[in-house]
From Swiss-Prot:
InterPro entries: Tobacco_rattle_virus_16kDa (IPR007968). This is Suppressor of RNA silencing. It is found in: Host cytoplasm; Host nucleus. Residues 102-113 have a biased composition (Basic residues). Keywords: Host cytoplasm, Host nucleus, Host-virus interaction, Inhibition of host innate immune response by virus, Suppressor of RNA silencing, Viral immunoevasion. The lineage of its organism: Viruses, Riboviria, Orthornavirae, Kitrinoviricota, Alsuviricetes. A motif (Bipartite nuclear localization signal 2) lies at residues 111-128. Weak suppressor of RNA-mediated gene silencing, also known as post-transcriptional gene silencing (PTGS), a mechanism of plant viral defense that performs sequence-specific inhibition of viral mRNAs expression. This could be used by the virus to infect efficiently the host the meristem cells. It comes from the Viruses. Residues 94-117 are annotated as: Disordered.
C-alpha cells in the first residue's frame, strides 16, 4: 500500500499505518485539521505537532495530543487540570449552600411568595452564569 499523502509514492512499511513516515503523518494531521478548521497544536510542551482529529459520520473528535510517545503524559496533565476545575466548582457550590443555609430559616415567608408568583412554562437554564465552570478553558482551541 502506498502513502495516502498527496504526491508521495513511497510504500507504507508499518502494518496499520496510513503514511510512510512520521513527518508525513504530521502533514496528514495538518491537512485534516485545516479541513475541519482546527488550529490547535499538541498539549505537550515543545512538541509543535498537530493534534489528532478523527472524523466520524456526523461529528469529529479533536484530541489534546498528537498521539506520539507523550500521549500518556498529556492525558494526565489534562485530567489533573479538569480535576482542579471540578474541585473549584464543588468549593463554590459548598460556599453557596452554606450562604443559603444561613438565610433559609429567616426567609420562609418570602419563599412562599416567590412560589406563588412563579411563572410556569419558562425554560430552565442549563448553564449558570454566576458559577465559573471553566468550560471556556476546556474547549479552547
Amino acid at each position: 500500500m502506498t502513502c495516502v499523502l498527496k504526491g508521495c509514492v513511497n510504500e507504507v512499511t508499518v502494518l496499520g499505518h496510513e503514511t510512510c513516515s512520521i513527518g508525513h503523518a504530521n502533514k496528514l494531521r495538518k491537512q485534516v485539521a485545516d479541513m475541519v478548521g482546527v488550529t490547535r497544536r499538541c498539549a505537550e510542551n515543545n512538541c509543535g505537532w498537530f493534534v489528532c482529529v478523527v472524523i466520524n459520520d456526523f461529528t469529529f473528535d479533536v484530541y489534546n495530543c498528537c498521539g506520539r510517545s507523550h500521549l500518556e503524559k498529556c492525558r494526565k496533565r489534562v485530567e489533573t487540570r479538569n480535576r482542579e476545575i471540578w474541585k473549584q466548582i464543588r468549593r463554590n457550590q459548598a460556599e453557596n449552600m452554606s450562604a443559603t443555609a444561613k438565610k433559609s430559616h429567616n426567609s420562609k415567608t418570602s419563599k412562599k411568595k416567590f412560589k406563588e408568583d412563579r411563572e410556569f412554562g419558562t425554560p430552565k437554564r442549563f448553564l449558570r452564569d454566576d458559577v465559573p465552570f471553566g468550560i471556556d478553558r476546556l474547549f479552547a482551541f
